[in-house]
Structures are given as C-alpha cells and as structure tokens.
C-alpha cells in the first residue's frame, strides 16, 4: 500500500508510509521491476540495421531516385521501335543497378572508413575544441560586458537623457492653408 490511510485498534488515524522499503532506487513491486527491466540501454554499436529500408530518414529521396523515365523520354510522334525501347529500359536499369553495386563493393568500405574518420574528427573537435572555446569566450567577454555596461550607464545614459529633455519641449504645429 502506498500513501493510504488506516485506523488502528484504538481508533487513531494513520497514513501508510509512501515507501515501506528503505532503498528508493530498487522497485518495491513486480510492476515497477518489470517496467525497469523493459527499458533497455541503447547502444549504437550493437543495433541491428534494416536491410530492406536502407534510407529510413529519407536522406536521398530527392537526389538519387533516378529511374529510366526521369532520364530518357520520347515525346509523341517521335518513338523508336518497341523492342529498342524495352531493350534500352532494361539496359539502363540493369547497368545502373550492377554498376552501383560494383562501385559500392569497390569503394563502399573505404568511403565508409573515410567518412567515419571525418565525422569522428569533427565530433572530437566539436567536443574538445569548439565548445570549450565558446565557453571560454563567454566567460572572458563578461569582463568586457561589465566595463561596457558601466560606460553606458555613466556616459551614454546621462547624455541621451539630457538630449531627450532638451527636445522634450519642442512643439510642432501644422496649419493647413486654403
């Protein structure tokens, strides 16, 4: 029981402690234990990849989705023989398919290695150089901002307040002449 109320044999009203066990980090019932065990740690290095949908975030939808109809088209009145058109379609499709596979077999792993190194360097520089430089700059600029704030409050504020008071009594009257 959590947070309930009960009456003892003498008629005194008591509340049940919210947690009867001492350790707040361990679940006190089976439902909580099951809930915690369902949460799995996500590890990017051991996740399974989808071999069917290889572009789940649709990065290349508008770039490399090139089919035969996107490249070669014959307008009305200018048609080649049907056999030539079918052979051209098959040649284009099969060539594109197998040449892509050949290129990815030859250069896929080296390019993955190069891009992996590049993004590792980029992540390293961002974590260990860029962010600390920005934080350092923000800390150092605070000193300058205080001096600038003092300058504004001691010089510019009174000056512009005086100029404002000078021009506050200026009145412009417009008359329409007929």
Swiss-Prot record:
Residues 105-125 dip into the membrane without crossing it. It is found in: Golgi apparatus membrane; Cell membrane; Membrane, Caveola; Membrane raft. Phosphorylated at Tyr-14 by ABL1 in response to oxidative stress. Ubiquitinated. Undergo monoubiquitination and multi- and/or polyubiquitination. Monoubiquitination of N-terminal lysines promotes integration in a ternary complex with UBXN6 and VCP which promotes oligomeric CAV1 targeting to lysosomes for degradation. Ubiquitinated by ZNRF1; leading to degradation and modulation of the TLR4-mediated immune response. Residues 2-104, 126-178 are cytoplasmic. One of its GO terms (biological process) is cell differentiation. Residues 82-94 are annotated as: Interaction with CAVIN3. The modification N-acetylserine is found at residue 2. The modification Phosphotyrosine is found at residues 6, 14, 25. The modification N6-acetyllysine is found at residue 5. One of its GO terms (molecular function) is transmembrane transporter binding. A lipid is attached at residues 133, 143, 156 (S-palmitoyl cysteine). It is a peripheral membrane protein. The modification Phosphoserine is found at residues 2, 9, 37. Residues 149-160 are annotated as: Interacts with SPRY1, SPRY2, and SPRY4. It holds the Pfam family Caveolin. Its main location: Golgi. Residues 2-94 are annotated as: Required for homooligomerization. There is a cross-link at residues 5, 26, 30, 39, 47, 57 (Glycyl lysine isopeptide (Lys-Gly) (interchain with G-Cter in ubiquitin)). Keywords: Acetylation, Cell membrane, Golgi apparatus, Isopeptide bond, Lipoprotein, Membrane, Palmitate, Phosphoprotein, Ubl conjugation. GO terms for cellular component: caveola; endosome; focal adhesion; Golgi membrane; membrane raft; perinuclear region of cytoplasm; sarcolemma. May act as a scaffolding protein within caveolar membranes. Forms a stable heterooligomeric complex with CAV2 that targets to lipid rafts and drives caveolae formation. Mediates the recruitment of CAVIN proteins (CAVIN1/2/3/4) to the caveolae. Interacts directly with G-protein alpha subunits and can functionally regulate their activity. Involved in the costimulatory signal essential for T-cell receptor (TCR)-mediated T-cell activation. Its binding to DPP4 induces T-cell proliferation and NF-kappa-B activation in a T-cell receptor/CD3-dependent manner. Homooligomer. Interacts with GLIPR2. Interacts with NOSTRIN. Interacts with SNAP25 and STX1A. Interacts (via the N-terminus) with DPP4; the interaction is direct. Interacts with CTNNB1, CDH1 and JUP. Interacts with PACSIN2; this interaction induces membrane tubulation. Interacts with SLC7A9. Interacts with BMX and BTK. Interacts with TGFBR1. Interacts with CAVIN3 (via leucine-zipper domain) in a cholesterol-sensitive manner. Interacts with CAVIN1. Interacts with EHD2 in a cholesterol-dependent manner. Belongs to the caveolin family. This is Caveolin-1. It comes from Saimiri boliviensis boliviensis (Bolivian squirrel monkey).
């Amino acid at each position: 029981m959590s947070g309930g109320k009960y009456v003892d044999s003498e008629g005194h009203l008591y509340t049940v402690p919210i947690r009867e066990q001492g350790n707040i980090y361990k679940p006190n019932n089976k439902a909580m234990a099951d809930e915690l065990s369902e949460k799995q740690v996500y590890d990017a290095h051991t996740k399974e990849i989808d071999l069917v949908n290889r572009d789940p975030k649709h990065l290349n939808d508008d770039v490399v989705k090139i089919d035969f109809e996107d490249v070669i088209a014959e307008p009305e009145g200018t048609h080649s023989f049907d056999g030539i058109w079918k052979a051209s379609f098959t040649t284009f499709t099969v060539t594109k398919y197998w040449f892509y596979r050949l290129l990815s077999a030859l250069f896929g792993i080296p390019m993955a290695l190069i891009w992996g190194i590049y993004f590792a360097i980029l992540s390293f520089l961002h974590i260990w150089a860029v962010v600390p430089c920005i934080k350092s700059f923000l800390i150092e600029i605070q000193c300058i901002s205080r001096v600038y704030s003092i300058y504004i409050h001691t010089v510019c504020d009174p000056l512009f307040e005086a100029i404002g008071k000078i021009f506050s009594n200026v009145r412009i009257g417009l008359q329409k002449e007929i």
